Amino acid sequence: MATPSPTPVPTPTWEQRMNDYVADRFKGRKVVGGAVVIARDGEVLYGRAYGHKNASKNDLVTLDTCFRIASVTKLVSVVGLMQLIEERGIDLDTPVRDIVGFKVINPSFPEQPITIRQVLSHTSSLLQTNHYFQNWETMTVWGPYFSKKDAPGTDYVYSNMNGGLIGAMIEALSGQSVNTYMQENVFGPLGINAAYHPTVLKDKSDIASQLNKKGGNVMTASRIMRESFDDTCNPIEHTDRTSGALYISANGMIRIIAMLEQGGTLDGVRILQPETIQLMMQDQRTIPGSSVQAESKYGLCIAKVEGLPGGTWYGHQGQMEGLSSNIYFQPDTGLSIAVIANGYEAHSEDGVVTIARTFMEKAQEFRTR
């Protein structure tokens, strides 16, 4: 009797190999839960969720799991602010105090106004701090929040305070809470489940816990859902929402960054004008009459990442506790990427966490798919 031939081992498909690659990278970094989504020319070509939503590892992450995405909040939020600036024809060199109706002044340079352009390029002379205050008027009389040696527009310092002012300006201009404005004008039109607190998400069924660098709980999703949230228009007291409080999924993040890559339109829905996005990518020193003289890593809440295959990427990164988040687009290739990693210790190379850089390099394989 003839010996039966061994059953051939199936050759892994390209998607299986990609899934294995993504899982290996997350596992190698000891990530508890994360996701990566890649699009080209506005169309999602690949998405993969990995791991778990919480420290107890009893719920799997999906591409629709909403994470608190830290400073990527700033780029998402500035989309709403730039809409209002477009609609009203506001000059970016307008003093912020003229928009919000309260003082935004460096006490060491009281005669030099802090402008919208300076805030969005992180050249406002506000310093970095993770300590938030009761209201903006309190902040303006406290010198420690401002540089004592560099006037507004003359030096780059990344500051969460700048991000917080985005929300104050949105609320002052729209007369709505930043959450309501963004729901009606950005998230809703793009079909995105996102909110500045999970209790006001449209779909509250898929939320990740906040984890530390060792994968333990900072705040469980169930505890977060017991918090109250003031969803009113109060620009003077809402100080930190647009600096890092947004909850959104990888599927939602890719729609934001793909919209920017596509010149402000996605699936037939226009959010911003193409010239606005070009301005957001630009070195603000080069604008005639600009209130920014300092070299900055940011245009208008958009950073450049150079030195990777395929050309320059544009976008933003977030880091908080054990989470990193990244959204970038690459104009030369039409690629966009969203990466979330939670419950691990992030390491960076040239200002971008290594796990995101790895996936940005791997994304080049999608240029011809």
Where is each model-derived feature located?
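Short, conserved catalytic-motif segment at the N-terminal edge
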Residues: 12-67, 89, 137-147
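Ser/Thr-rich, Proline-interspersed low-complexity disordered segments
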Residues: 1-13
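Short clusters of small/polar residues that mark proteolytic maturation junctions
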Residues: 49-51, 222-223, 325, 341
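Short, gly/Ser/Thr-rich active-site loops of penicillin-recognizing serine hydrolases
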Residues: 12, 284-288, 293, 307, ...
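Extracytoplasmic/secreted proteins, especially bacterial periplasmic and envelope-associated proteins
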Residues: 13, 17-21, 71, 76, ...
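Short active-site loop at a secondary-structure junction
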Residues: 27-35, 56-118, 150-162, 241-244, ...
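Short, well-ordered beta-strand elements
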Residues: 324-343
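Short, surface-exposed loop or secondary-structure junction motifs
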Residues: 54, 107-314
